[in-house]
């Protein structure tokens, strides 16, 4: 063979690819496309990122194959040297360049641009030339292994890997048999990927593919390639520009110029490539990785909830009484198995948090010169207080396949998914004073027995001196219409006449069963006028109903604001119904069949029933319209013939309050209040009217218990004072004296704490 020809053939070889493959990577590596030892390769720039070896490595690693095993042998090895470049005197003995290459250099001129260098020289001939290398052929078998899958299939990943190594070692002895068995393992387990590589002349008598340089160059630790920059064969005035152009091509992918300033290097992007500094692909991969980490963060909490330690802890919690956050915390701290499991979770969360922070820092570092602003929020760690609240929610808000969040301040659940079926029966509270001594076996929500000094009355504990039967002589709190919530809902759907409360409709702005324009605020009231007509009754509201009809293709959706006056009085002495807040119900809208009318129903039930004398309903529309389309007056007959306006009109054909009346003995109650007032003015002679004090305390407690819900931490409304003012006609000073006397008796004689209330009337 003509060795001179071989030297001339390869002395201008340009090595345009750099292939790096790890022989082994720890199986504990993450799912990112590169591990920590390859962080310097994260930027998507230059030919390396698109080389075949790197792409194969990335693809296999994404599929979970974290270990590579390669067995190979080489044939027909020749050492070659570029003797032309080894000459030191290139002026007297110039390098014999190819005519096409010389023509390309002449086309550059004396001041070529970066793009000219890239298009004319670098893309055709590369950036380096070969100094010395080894020629020959290679036959290799490469296996990519996923040790986690091998472990699941065989039970011992180490033994499986050793067995695969022994099988692969017989490749050169029995190639066909080895490949057949490896392919069977690959198909049955999916834990390995097998690749064969055969390049170069595989025998001393075969030189058919010597013209393909890449097929006969050997790349191994023994057969190293020696390269040198192509600038050494350029004229001196082109050498610096070539280096800049080569760096721009490799680091900026030919989309800008590589510039270094103040120890920082970046790509100065061309106009047609404004995002050349931004590795979009890597950023997207990192964002996907962070999303996966956040998902695994949430799954770690679910794993703890599904663990045997947590389930056994939930089973050991007592279910015969209500558990506060404090009592759950005591049980939590006493469960050593759960504590050990919780510590493992905390350590895993800390490692995961650091991993997320490192990835996020890399993400933001890569996005410094991007127009793309990454949006990432570090997942919040669940505190011990949140875990205790979670346990409480699992205890009391996990029923009928629904779940929700428990609010201890209100002893109720906020169900998720717009349903109210998640709440289980809330057990009674066991404690001292008027708390239960034991919950009822028939109904765990009620008391079964009371502490010393208290007696059981209708499922609750009251002081023994209180005669609840006697308070019925003043106000008949217990009636035949105290149905369960399911019964009430059924009766409301049937419009049962027993629940009708006959009220008077009052409105200066709308008329029933008449179309009107709701785009301005409309007001209507339903009142009982009990002070004039029904002085011997007070009234309870348990629901409301309205029938609203709309024009066809109407875009309006009415919105209601409802104020309740419990015992008459002005509008300022009413309270607003907090629909959908603090567990309060919402309006239910049902369309009537073959009609443009809807039934709007509000079911308060036994939980939210309350006193009422007057109901004020303010009606608004959710649709905002131009001023020209508005009815400025909002009164008078409407023009239904105008097609531009009639689609906004609605009418209320029926409005009804559901509830019942309680018998109220105003004279008897007034005499009891006067006794308390006199005892207070005489210097606190409580003992002379002890039974009256206990009686009024019981009445006040039962009335204020029907107050509307308030935000956590805020006092309830004082409905008892409203009753004294409007039904008994007491003055403000008399009301203050009565309440003060009752508070003193409750704290000094009964040694009980007073519940703070807010003034309403």
Swiss-Prot record:
Glycans are attached at residues 156, 433, 443, 553, 599, 631, 677. InterPro entries: BRINP, MACPF. One of its GO terms (cellular component) is neuronal cell body. Keywords: Cell cycle, Cytoplasm, Glycoprotein, Growth arrest, Neurogenesis, Signal. Residues 68-251 form the MACPF domain. Pfam families: BRINP (PF19052), EGF_BRNP1-3 (PF25415), MACPF (PF01823). The keyword Transmembrane helix does not apply. Residues 1-16 form the signal peptide. It is found in: Cytoplasm. GO terms for biological process: cellular response to retinoic acid; central nervous system neuron differentiation; negative regulation of mitotic cell cycle; positive regulation of neuron differentiation. Plays a role in neurogenesis and brain development. May suppress cell cycle progression in postmitotic neurons by inhibiting G1/S transition. Belongs to the BRINP family. This is BMP/retinoic acid-inducible neural-specific protein 1. It comes from Bos taurus (Bovine).
């Amino acid at each position: 063979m003509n060795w001179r020809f071989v030297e001339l053939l390869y002395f201008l070889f340009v090595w345009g690819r750099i292939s790096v493959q790890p022989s082994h990577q720890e199986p504990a590596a993450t799912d990112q496309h590169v591990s920590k030892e390859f962080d310097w390769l994260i930027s998507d720039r230059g030919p390396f990122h698109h080389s075949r070896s790197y792409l194969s490595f990335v693809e296999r690693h994404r599929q979970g194959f974290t270990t590579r095993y390669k067995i190979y042998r080489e044939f027909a090895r020749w050492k070659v040297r570029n003797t032309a470049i080894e000459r030191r005197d290139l002026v007297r003995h110039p390098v014999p360049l190819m005519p096409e290459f010389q023509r390309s250099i002449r086309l550059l001129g004396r001041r070529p641009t970066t793009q000219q260098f890239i298009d004319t020289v670098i893309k055709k001939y590369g950036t380096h030339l070969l100094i010395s290398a080894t020629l020959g052929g290679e036959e290799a078998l490469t296996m990519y292994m996923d040790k986690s899958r091998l472990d699941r299939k065989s039970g011992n990943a180490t033994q499986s890997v050793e067995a695969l190594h022994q099988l692969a070692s017989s490749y050169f002895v029995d190639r066909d048999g080895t490949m057949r068995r490896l392919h069977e393992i690959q198909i049955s387990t999916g834990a390995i990927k097998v690749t064969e590589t055969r390049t170069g002349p595989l025998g001393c008598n075969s030189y058919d593919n010597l013209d393909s340089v890449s097929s006969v160059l050997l790349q191994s630790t023994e057969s190293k390639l020696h390269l040198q920059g192509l600038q050494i064969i350029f004229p001196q005035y082109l050498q610096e520009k070539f280096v800049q152009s080569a760096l721009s091509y490799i680091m900026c992918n030919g989309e800008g110029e590589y510039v270094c300033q103040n120890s920082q290097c970046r790509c100065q992007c061309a106009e047609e490539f404004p995002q050349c500094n931004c590795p979009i692909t890597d950023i997207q991969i990192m964002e996907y990785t962070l999303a996966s980490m956040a998902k695994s963060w949430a799954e770690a909490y679910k794993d703890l909830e599904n663990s045997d330690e947590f389930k056994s802890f939930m089973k050991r919690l007592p279910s015969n009484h209500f558990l506060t956050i404090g009592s759950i915390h005591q049980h939590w701290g006493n469960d050593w198995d759960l504590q050990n499991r919780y510590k493992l979770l905390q350590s895993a969360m800390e490692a995961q948090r650091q991993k997320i922070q490192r990835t996020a820092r890399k993400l933001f570092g890569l996005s410094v010169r991007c127009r793309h602003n990454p949006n990432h929020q570090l997942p919040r760690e669940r505190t011990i207080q949140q875990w205790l609240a979670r346990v409480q929610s699992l205890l009391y808000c996990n029923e009928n396949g629904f779940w929700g969040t428990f609010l201890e301040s209100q002893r109720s659940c906020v169900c998720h998914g717009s349903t109210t079926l998640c709440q289980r029966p809330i057990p009674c509270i066991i404690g001292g004073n008027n708390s239960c001594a034991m919950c009822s076996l028939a109904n765990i929500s009620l008391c079964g027995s009371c502490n010393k000094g208290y007696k059981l009355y209708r499922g609750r504990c009251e002081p023994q001196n209180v005669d609840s039967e006697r308070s019925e002589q003043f106000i008949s709190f217990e009636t035949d219409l105290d149905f369960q919530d399911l019964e009430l809902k059924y009766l409301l759907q049937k419009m049962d006449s027993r629940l009708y409360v006959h009220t008077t409709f009052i409105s200066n702005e709308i008329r029933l069963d008449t179309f009107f324009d709701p785009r301005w605020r409309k007001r209507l009231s339903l009142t009982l006028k009990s002070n004039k007509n029904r002085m011997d009754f007070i009234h309870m509201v348990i629901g409301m109903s309205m029938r609203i009809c709309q024009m066809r293709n109407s875009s309006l959706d009415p919105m209601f604001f409802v104020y309740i006056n419990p015992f008459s009085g002005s509008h300022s002495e009413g309270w607003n119904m907090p629909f959908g807040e603090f567990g309060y119900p919402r309006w239910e809208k049902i369309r009537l069949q073959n009609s443009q009318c809807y039934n709007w129903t509000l079911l308060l039930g036994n939980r939210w029933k309350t006193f009422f004398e007057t109901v004020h309903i303010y009606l608004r529309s959710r649709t905002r319209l131009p001023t020209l389309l508005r009815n400025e007056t909002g009164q008078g007959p409407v023009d239904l013939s105008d097609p531009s306006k009639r689609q906004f009109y609605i009418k209320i054909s029926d409005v009804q309050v559901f509830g019942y009346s309680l018998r109220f003995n105003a004279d008897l109650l007034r005499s009891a209040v006067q006794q308390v007032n006199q005892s207070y003015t005489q210097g606190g002679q409580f003992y002379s009217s002890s039974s009256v004090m206990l009686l009024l305390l019981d009445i006040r407690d039962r009335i204020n218990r029907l107050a509307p819900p308030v935000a956590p931490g805020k006092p309830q409304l004082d409905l008892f004072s409203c009753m004294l003012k409007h039904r008994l006609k007491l003055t403000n000073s008399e009301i203050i004296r009565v309440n003060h006397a009752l508070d003193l008796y409750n704290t000094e004689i009964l040694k009980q704490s007073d519940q703070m209330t807010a003034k309403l009337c």
